[in-house]
Amino acid sequence: AGFGAPMVVYLTPWDYDYITNIDLILRYDFRYDPAYASQIIDERMRALGAEKIGGKWYYGGKPVTIKFVIRVEDERRQIGDAIASDLEKAGFTVERMYMEFGPAIETVYDTDPAEFRWQIYTEGWGRTGILKYDSDPGAFIAPWEGNMPGWAVEGWWQYQNAELDELTQKLYRGEFASREERDRMMKRVLELALQDSVRLWVATRLDSYIAREDLTGISQDIGAGLRSLLVWRNAYVLGKSDLTLGHLWVWTTRTTWNPMQVALVGGFVDVYSVDQAYLTSDPSTWIHPYTGIPIPFRSSWEVRTAGPTGSINVPADAYIWDAENDRWVSAGGATAKSVVTFDYSRFLQSNWHHGIQISLADLLYHVATRFEVAFDKEKSALEPAISGTLSESLKTIKGIRILPDNRVEVYIDYWFFDNAYIAQFAELWPTLMVPWEVIAASDRLNYVEKKYAYGGASSRARGVSWLNLVLAEHASDVVAELDKMHTEGFFPASYFTLGNSVFETPAGAQERYSTAIDWGNEHRHMWISNGPFYLDSFDSAAQTSVLKAFRDPTYPFKPGDNFYPFITPVQILRIGKGTVVPGSSAQFLIDAEGEGVLKSRYLIRDVATGQILAVGDSESVTPKRMLIRLSPDFTSKLTPGALYELIVATYSEDAATISVSRDFFDVLSLAPVEREIEAVSKELTDRLRAVSEDLATAISGLSTAVSNVDSKLDRTADNIRSEVRSSVEDVRARVDAATNTLTNDIRNLQAVAQSTLTVAQIVMALAVIAIVLSVVSVIRRPKAAATA
């Protein structure tokens, strides 16, 4: 328990974007209800012409069969079996197809859905980091990115959703004017995805990992955990030179290392390849492991933007790749929303793993070959999924300008409300990079020889191998192609020529070919990169790979660089609830822990109806304490005695995860109190009436006594004084008796009043009594005068 959470959309309860979409996500009160599900299934199946015979569905005399690919390596085996059993109970015949990673991936992602080789698959995804603002929801829900059934392979059946494509492309390209507009678009995208639900999100898992007690230097990535690019770079055991890491797989048939890393459709589409490759390559830009904001890694940047509606002129000495004529052309005259200046010194003053110095030629060839696959008709036809994904981002690049001192300007038609995201979007240097000569040899094998493909779906559609630089057979073909290039004197000069500037030479190309060939012959793979470790050997059959520290003196980082210690994650500790009374304000105190100043967003839902009644933000009391305030107007609309759910999502700007907690409160019913007040009021009225009658009698007696005094003034002074004293004493006794009775009544009334919540009426009653006592006091004053 506690190592997972239910999912409704692809966002988890720990994602920052969950906060702004919490009302949408929680509006769908999904729950396990097989009876209700069967009712809906029965209605739809009969409407489609199916018959239920003996508890099983038939169509055209044949059982309705669902082909269910169930992964066996983890919890998905149990999830798959549970879902399959419920489908069988609902009347379907389920063909349970138990598979490990490789066969499952090939069946699902490398086949035309129209072949009906599968209908349901227990898909799973690993995370490589945390994002504060996700700009690419289309990767999971929109057809244009090639990661939906059909996989953008020409000739295959394709899932289509034009509105999802349009909205996710706008989000991807930054086509919004404010954060608020972006959030509205994101909410609409999630709603559309829920309505179609090609992917049904079930649960997110919180992984626990086992490590030696003496292992130190592990960085914390609150989104990726041990999958992070950062985690192992500074890890060590004191006194030992080696680290042995356990992984479920080092290689599967889906584990593909190739230079065309494009979202989820090129190389590196599985966690098993990515986890290893991250140790061998340095990104230019990465994601902060706490905040989820893009940060410089092996480059630095400066951002200048004209905003969502402004423009910046692209200078004539900026260039763009012309895929039709295969050359760099001036981009002068174009306009862009933003320009980012990157300093690539820490790349360009260092070496590749095979000893050749990294140069701008590597960057220029990489950018050009991506424009080629995106916009060259022949190449895009060979790699349609990769082309469709790349073209959307490359359309926004308006020019590249080479500056002195290893700096490169990138002009892009893109804006975001956080400049760091503009820099990330403009980044040309890929996370996983190889030298240009390896890319060139791979391109020739794909586009010229047509022996390999960069994408998994395209490889199956074309009937060729999916290029994998760590497999010995594939590496041998790359080496052979490099040898041809060396022999031919192959030199793609146009790739390196911008105006009058040329960034590579034929002699430099020949040296690169020879050095890369030597690497391939020695290591029996062609993964050459630039990170803190190099891939020394890879054995797919033995499921082992060996990575060795790259000790080249030109490598820019030293031990301790890029280390991120553990921090306190955001966690709600308690919710303090006040009494909620209709028509009165109410408060809830939220105490939490975590980095920085904490904030909360809350939601109130009617438990009986499921309706969301309020969504709002907390007030800050202290950095770790927040106050939720409900207005009298809001509470006046709550039903006395009803139960309501309070859902609180607490977050920090310093750590892009959230903590979600739920609690319940009821609303105080005032009906019993009102009945008690009514009873007390009646009793108070009756007693005051009795006291008034006693006082009237006393006053009448006093008047009679005074009259008697007047009539006996002719008596002797002693007799008069005696009679007056006797009469006054009699009146005094009667008044005292009435006063004592009144005092007792007051005490009784006070006791009753304390059992009610309406102090105001009691105060009014006491005020009336005070007036009466004043009258009594006035009546008693003549006695004192008479005795003077």
Feature annotation, model-predicted:
Residues 1-5, 9, 29-30, 95-105, ...:
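Extracytoplasmic/peripheral linker and loop segments enriched in polar/acidic and small residues
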Residues 1-85, 89, 188, 231-233, ...:
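Append "and occasionally in soluble cytosolic enzymes with long acidic Gly/Pro-rich linkers
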Residues 34-39, 252, 261-271, 278-281, ...:
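Gly/Pro-rich hinge or "lid" segments in bacterial periplasmic/extracellular proteins
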Residues 56-60, 103, 166-167, 184, ...:
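Surface-exposed, Gly/Pro/Thr- and Asp/Glu-enriched linker/hinge segments
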Residues 81-90, 103-118, 355:
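Short helices/loops that flank or line small-molecule/ion binding pockets
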Residues 141, 145, 207-255, 259-270, ...:
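Long beta-strand-rich cores associated with HINT superfamily self-processing modules
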Residues 675-754:
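Extended alpha-helical stalk/coiled-coil segments
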Residues 772-788:
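C-terminal membrane-anchoring or membrane-association module
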